[in-house]
Amino acid sequence: MVDTQTDSPTISNKTLVLAMLLAGACSYLLPILSVSSPRMTSLHADFAGRSDISALNDKIEWLTQKRAIDNLTSTEKTALDKELETATNFLIDQLDTPQQALPFQRSSPQTLPPFPAELDYDVFDKSQSVPRLFISRMPALDKEDAQRRKQQFIQIMLPLILKVNDEISTHKQVIMTALKSGNEDVLDAFARKYGLSKLQQSREQRRLSLQIRVQPIPVEIALAQAAVESGWGQSRFTHEGNALFGQWVWDVSKGIKPAQASNSRAAVRAFPDLISSVRSYMTNLNTHHAYEAFRKRRSELHLSGDIDVSGLQLVPFLYRYAETGSEYVETLTQMIKQNELHKLASRKLPSGGVS
């Protein structure tokens, strides 16, 4: 596949005192230590998988929803505006922090954890909530029953995909607020985050590009690609390096070398946990030039009023994801149809507040 992203990020060792940023919206605080930054005090918590960014995303979403309440007093609005600005600035600081790849510990298929009973839910039954459970490593799936194995894979992947899509939706919400208020600092940070900083664009072009790039990935596409690229979670790259989407890295120290590879430096990118793999995959589709047509068509469908964009409408624009081109598109199409993944397009995570 085409992938020239930077490596999966980690949080630096710099830390700072940050009193009560996440208080009020959650029952806990991020671990906090101390240091200063040129622009403002910056948050650097040593959380694998960037869970501090997730918490800030949730915090911003919670504050935005609370700010929209009609009967707030002017004092309450002012306090919420200030807290929202602080949380947004911390998010900017995180987006701007230079990050390096987290080391991964190669795991053995013989030591796969058991499938968690808490994830044994009916993915197609909309009366059942998708659990807010985000496991870090692929467990042992059913070896005897292929249908049951597929079901378990979807049960694991669906919460992860929905979680990262929620994060992207929060980014989108913050960007829309910044567009309305003219907050160029926020827009600059997201331009860097979504690969626009190197492009020679006017501010108006950058704003349009952000609106095109910062969009969730259709659930059925993410599930289908994860199933195809990981062999329904059975590939050694998934077991040993949490690699779900067959992304490449040109440094064997940061990935797992395939048995056969035309380039001696090529390896399948490894990740510290499964959600990092999902984040990297979605960032790739939302930023790499190979998927520009995919993003453009997605945006056109949104602008036409198609709020819940169908994955089947976008699959043809992923022909550059694999060397097989049109054959790969057909494989994804059949994967979605045969496994009825399109029926999961409207699934959402239950509201969990800041978690």
Where would I find each of the regions flagged by the language model?
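Catalytic cores of secreted/periplasmic lytic hydrolases that degrade extracellular macromolecules
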Residues: V2-A224, V228-S355
